[in-house]
């Protein structure tokens, strides 16, 4: 039987095409795509808090209460050990609404958190507060409002907290806002409250 060169080439090509799937089946690595690490989500929010407070019990705004919400963002510097990381604050924004029609406010600043144990922590805040309260001379301010002098005010806050688990924690808080004597009136506000927090 005489085989021509073109027919031999065609037979070889056909055999290669038919054998390719079988070769891939025999070699499992040929069917597995190259590994690609998963894309990690970039979260800038560190923690969300919600709570309430009693508005300055010793002032004209006593016997009123607030609802408070707060967002803490991720630290701008990471990779430090536990000790030095405590000195890097988390940028913070929040707001407090007085449900009885007295002074409400929004604020921004920085929060420092220090761990006492794995579950107990303390923290401090410093920043600025912007309010809708009364700023005029005390003589012209209604008896049920504090004379805050001006806006914005300095805001300082402190808290002690307990971590229930890796996500949830509870806190007792105190906050103070005033203008440090930079305006004519400076009654300020000192509020006491509590929060529940969720860490992302």
Q: Residue spans of the language-model regions?
A:
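Short coil turns and loop connectors of transmembrane beta-barrels in diderm outer membranes
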Residues: 44, 87, 102, 116-118, ...
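Cleavable N-terminal export/targeting peptides
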Residues: 1-40
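Solvent-exposed loop/turn segments connecting transmembrane beta-strands
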Residues: 56-64, 95-106, 116-118, 130, ...
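Membrane-embedded beta-strand positions of outer-membrane beta-barrel proteins
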Residues: 48-52, 91-95, 122-126, 156-160, ...
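Residue-level signature of outer-membrane beta-barrel architecture
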Residues: 71-75, 112-114, 162, 176, ...
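Repeated loop/turn-to-beta-strand initiation elements of outer-membrane beta-barrel proteins
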Residues: 76-81, 118-122, 166-170
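Outer-membrane beta-barrel "beta-signal"
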Residues: 65-69, 189-200
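Outer-membrane beta-barrel translocator/channel fold
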Residues: 55, 123-157, 161
């Amino acid at each position: 039987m005489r085989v021509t060169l073109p027919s031999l080439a065609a037979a070889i090509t056909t055999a290669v095409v038919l054998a390719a799937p079988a070769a891939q089946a025999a070699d499992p690595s040929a069917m597995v795509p190259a590994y690609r690490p998963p894309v990690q989500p970039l979260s800038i929010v560190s923690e969300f808090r919600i709570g309430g407070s009693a508005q300055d019990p010793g002032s004209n705004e006593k016997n009123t209460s607030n609802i408070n919400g707060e967002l803490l963002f991720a630290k701008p510097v990471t990779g430090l050990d536990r000790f030095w990381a405590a000195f890097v604050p988390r940028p913070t924004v929040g707001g407090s609404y007085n449900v009885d029609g007295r002074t409400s406010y929004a604020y921004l600043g920085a929060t420092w958190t220090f761990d006492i144990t794995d579950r107990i922590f303390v923290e401090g805040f410093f920043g600025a507060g912007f309010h809708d309260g009364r700023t005029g001379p005390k003589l012209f301010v209604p008896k049920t409002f504090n004379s805050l002098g001006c806006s914005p005010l300095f805001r300082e806050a402190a808290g002690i907290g307990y971590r229930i688990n890796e996500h949830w924690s509870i806190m007792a808080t105190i906050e103070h806002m005033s203008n440090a004597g930079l305006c004519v009136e400076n009654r300020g506000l000192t509020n006491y409250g509590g929060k529940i927090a969720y860490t992302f």
